[in-house]
Swiss-Prot record:
Chain positions recorded as Na(+) binding sites: G74, T77
Name of the protein this chain belongs to: Fluoride-specific ion channel FluC
Source organism per UniProt: Mesorhizobium japonicum (strain LMG 29417 / CECT 9101 / MAFF 303099) (Mesorhizobium loti (strain MAFF 303099))
UniProt family annotation: Belongs to the fluoride channel Fluc/FEX (TC 1.A.43) family.
Membrane topology, as annotated: Multi-pass membrane protein
Length: 124
């Protein structure tokens, strides 16, 4: 139960940071392109890689990993978790599965979003 609390609290922090980042991007560059989301995905993926490498080198508790990686970075962007999964497959030498995962994840998510839109719009 404590591990779940770590993820929930970290996720709330990450989501708050994501919201503030999006609001800042809207003020800076306007709403014509999703700059905030793109920045969040790139920065979150970089931060996830940095954190995981430091954690692996210096060691760290499962609780710290859950709070920071799963919670904060997961709340900030799930794209960072996706990027870490891709990198893990790649570093294991599973190049084809890594690219299959990336392709299926991106295309599958976009198709699922459009299906959700279609379903919601077709309801009375």
């Amino acid at each position: 139960m404590f591990n779940l609390l770590l993820v929930v609290v970290g996720g709330g922090i990450g989501a708050g940071i994501r919201h503030l980042t999006n609001m800042g991007a809207l003020r800076l560059v306007g709403p014509n392109y999703p700059w905030g989301t793109m920045a969040i995905n790139i920065v979150g993926s970089f931060a996830m890689g940095l954190f995981i490498a430091i954690l692996a080198r210096r060691g760290g508790s499962n609780e710290v990993r859950l709070f920071v990686a799963t919670g904060i970075f997961g709340g900030f962007t799930t794209f960072s978790a996706f990027s870490l999964d891709f990198a893990t497959l790649w570093e294991r030498g599973a190049t084809l599965p890594a690219f299959g995962y990336a392709l299926a994840s991106v295309i599958g998510a976009i198709i699922a979003l459009f299906l959700g839109l279609w379903l919601a719009r077709s309801l009375p």
